[in-house]
Every structure is written in structure tokens, then in C-alpha cells.
Amino acid sequence: NEEVEKLKAFVESGGGLVVMEEPLVLTDFADRPDPLATYLSESFGIVLGNDIVVDFTSQQPFVAVANSYASHPITQKMQGLVSLFPTTRSVSVTGEFNDLNRTELVLTAENAWAETDLQSLQGGEQIELQPDPGVDMLGPVSLAVVIESLGKQNRLIVYGDADFANDANFMQYGNGDLLINSIDWAAGQENLIKLTPKDSIQRVLIPPGRYTMGLILFGFVFLVPGAVLFSGIVVWIQRRKRG
């Protein structure tokens, strides 16, 4: 709670914040309330779902693939790029907050859903993963929410996953760009948000021809040993003269 109070004071003073919350079952909170999630819900109407997103777009159902982004400075140049979120929870908005601009920033495809039957998943049971339309949030599932206060000019981005930003996943697809852009935007540095696709360069190894190979062979077989031998003779002659 003390850490949350410090973050709260920082945000209320106009600071920017990037939050990455793992699914509750993967944290130390387990069934206990998360103070940070409570603060985000009460102050900004952000709902961090008690769920795990299932997405069969990838070969691993618990790796959510984001292929759609809201129109926002963070993602304006990311259209066409996908980003991967291993073991992520849903992040959405609720209620009315007239002094806030809130945007669901990152979305999965329609065939994904936020699975709420975590007990079965934790039990290691062999279950068929199917969404429950009456309980689970059906896709497209929001994986991140961005908030901008109209009065205090503070900025927040809340992700339902932290693994997408670790060393193993940072360079995967658009993950690194999404994280860096989020930090730049939260810090009020929109001018640093530059995502210019680099033209791919095709490199082809051209093997040397016979003439070139002959020169290389001649150099290694004759010139290099000859130079070493010549240097040795010169040193020997100089020593003879001194002696």
C-alpha cells in the first residue's frame, strides 16, 4: 500500500506512468486484492480482469497476438505490426470519467477470449479450451488501456502483461516498439515516437572465382611463409654483423 500511495502522489502531481500487471494467478496476491489494481479501478475506471487471455492465433494458446491498435500516437505507425503477450489478462474500462480520455489501445483478434475458469487451468486438468459466452469476455479482447487526464495532463498506460517487455520477448515483432513508444508518450516525449520501417537488405555470398581462389592459395602457401622466412634471414644477418 505504501508503494501505491507513492505512485498515486506521483500521478496526481502530473507524472506519467506505465503499468504492467500480470494475471492475478501468476502473482503473489493469489486470491487477495491487488492494491494497485484497486487504485486504477477507483481512480480511472480501469478493469484488470481476473482472467487469462486464450488465443489460438498463435501455436501457443496462452500467447495472445495483438493485431489491431486504436488510433493513438503510441500506435499510429504500428499498423501492420503484431505484438505478442504471453500469459496476459484483459484490461478494459468501465464507468464514466468525464475528465479522462480513455482508450482501449491494443486488441486481439475476434477468436480470442478472456478465460475466467482459472481453477481448472491451475489444476492441470485436461480440459478443452472453449469460451463461455455468458462468463468469459469474448474477442476482440483489450490488452492495454491508455488514459490522459484533461485537467492535470498526466498520462497512464496499463498493460495486462509484463512478459511482453522482458529480454526474451522485447525484440519479438512490434513488442519493443510498443514499449518504447508507451514510455515516450507517458513522459510527454511524442517527438521521440518514431517507427520508420527499415528496408530489408538482401545479402548474398558470391563465391570467388578460380583466378581469385588461385591468388588466395598462392598468398597463403608461398607469400606468407616467404615473408616470414625473409624476416628471419634479415634478423639473423643483423645479429651476425653485431656479433
Where are these regions (language model features)?
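Acidic, S/T/G-rich, low-cysteine, solvent-exposed domains in lumenal/extracellular/periplasmic regions
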Residues: 1-191
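Residue-level signal for alpha-helical context at structural boundaries
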Residues: 58, 123, 193-201, 243
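Short, aromatic-rich amphipathic segments at membrane interfaces
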Residues: 164, 169, 194-220
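Hydrophobic alpha-helical transmembrane segments of integral membrane proteins
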Residues: 220-222, 228
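Juxtamembrane interface at the cytosolic side of transmembrane helices
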Residues: 228-243
